[in-house]
Amino acid sequence: MAGLSSLPSRVVVLMGGPSAEREVSLSTGRGCAEALRGEGFDVIEVDPGVTHAGAELCARLQEIQPDVVFNALHGRWGEDGCVQGLLEWMRLPYTHSGVLSSALAMDKTRAKTALKAHGLPVVDSIIAPKEAVVAAHVMATPYVVKPNNEGSSVGVYLVNEAANGPPHLSDDMPDEVMVETYAPGRELTVSVLGDAPGDPGALTVTDILTDGWYDYDAKYKPGGSRHVVPAQIPQEIWDACMDMAVRAHTILGCKGVSRTDYRWDEARGLDGLIILEVNTQPGMTPTSLTPEQGEAVGMSFGKLCRWLVEDATCDR
């Protein structure tokens, strides 16, 4: 961990931005900014806006001269290596993962390929033209259709056995989409902090309970889902979740914090545990999983945000 030379330090919290996950990012950013102020940091909130205004952001950061940039952006531009490259070019220390790992994890197909090459179980999927997906079933139901490079369950469609035809996708879905086999079972997740000896590592396992599909509302609206922390699961499954999360974090080259999401089909035991995806910018809203896991292991939300700031470096 790269500690800061003096406190309080000036921290810019990047939030909002141009992606479909703008509202989630604004919620994350406000919460993190408040927590960091409570930890004694001089915090300035900066929203790059919705127009990919890189030049304007550079000018604003040059004006502020922050010691650290806390990246609370989600989705395209903020989570895919773009803003990370800009910050490295400006030689500004920043939180979370770097250019390569952010780009790799954001591209779900390539991330799965990397994880699978290292022996980790992932959900089978294909990339298909949007026009083909809306014209006919491209795989046996049930299956899931989603953008290859968005998160927070934005633009995710579940096509089940009862569907009479292919899904009707919204106009803002990309020309190519990911279609993946639906993985049944319980939704489990593990957050990982750091990548060096002495760092917290894997925190704990959460079991996410919902009354139906774990969609955007279930993730972010109060009462949309119930979280059991720590998860009440067999030790073998617990150990596998913790181990695979650290391995996935390492394989993709993640820095700071990541969160690995799973499905577990209880009837199949260990063979039923499969990775859905790895998030390099996990949500930090009041209902988010990573802050909740931190609290469960004795790390307050403020201390979690502080840890990320003190972990910030210029070359991630």
Swiss-Prot record:
Species, as recorded: Jannaschia sp. (strain CCS1)
Entry's Gene Ontology cellular component terms: cytoplasm
Family: Belongs to the D-alanine--D-alanine ligase family.
Keyword list, A-Z: ATP-binding, Cell shape, Cell wall biogenesis/degradation, Cytoplasm, Ligase, Magnesium, Manganese, Metal-binding, Nucleotide-binding, Peptidoglycan synthesis
Residues where Mg(2+) 2 binds: E277, N279
InterPro entries noted in UniProt: ATP-grasp, ATP_grasp_subdomain_1, D-Ala_lig_Van_CS, D_ala_D_ala, Dala_Dala_lig_C, Dala_Dala_lig_N, PreATP-grasp_dom_sf
Catalyses which reaction(s): 2 D-alanine + ATP = D-alanyl-D-alanine + ADP + phosphate + H(+)
UniProt: Mg(2+) 1 binding residues: D261, E277
NCBIfam families recorded: D_ala_D_alaTIGR, PRK01372.1
Primary enzyme class: ligase
Gene3D superfamilies per UniProt: 3.40.50.20, ATP-grasp fold, A domain, ATP-grasp fold, B domain
Keyword Cytoplasm: yes
Binding residue positions for ATP: 139-189
Protein name listed in UniProt: D-alanine--D-alanine ligase
EC number: 6.3.2.4
Gene Ontology biological process terms from the UniProt entry: cell wall organization; peptidoglycan biosynthetic process; regulation of cell shape
